[in-house]
Amino acid sequence: MQAETSRGPLTGPDAGGPVPAGEPQWRALLETRWRARLQEVTELALAYHEAAAAADRGTGGGAGGRRAQPLLRLLRRTVTSRRALADTEEALARLSAGRYGWCESCAGAIPAQRLAATPEARYCARCARGRGR
């Protein structure tokens, strides 16, 4: 006899989703991505602060016009990297909670192929298309 949840029957060794919470390959993949993204965020944030300090020391005391563009690009890259880091942290939390691999929209299973391509995926391909992701 299988137990049921609002998502359907519980399956797998941990009954937590299409990807068992204890499956080390997914945790290792996400942790590797987390470390790389943390390093990237750290480097970008340091580079931004160094560039901003250099701009403040520049002539005129302002960073207007052309001099502001590199700072803005660096800031955008930093923000994007922080979002990616947060996505990876959320995927790790879902894995620990047994929710990794379940679509947050339709509650259906996210195929392992999609997770392999996009380990932080929160939505199945159909729901992601509907959300414009």
Which residues are covered by each model-predicted region?
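A broad detector of the eukaryotic-type serine/threonine protein kinase catalytic domain
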Residues: 93, 108-111
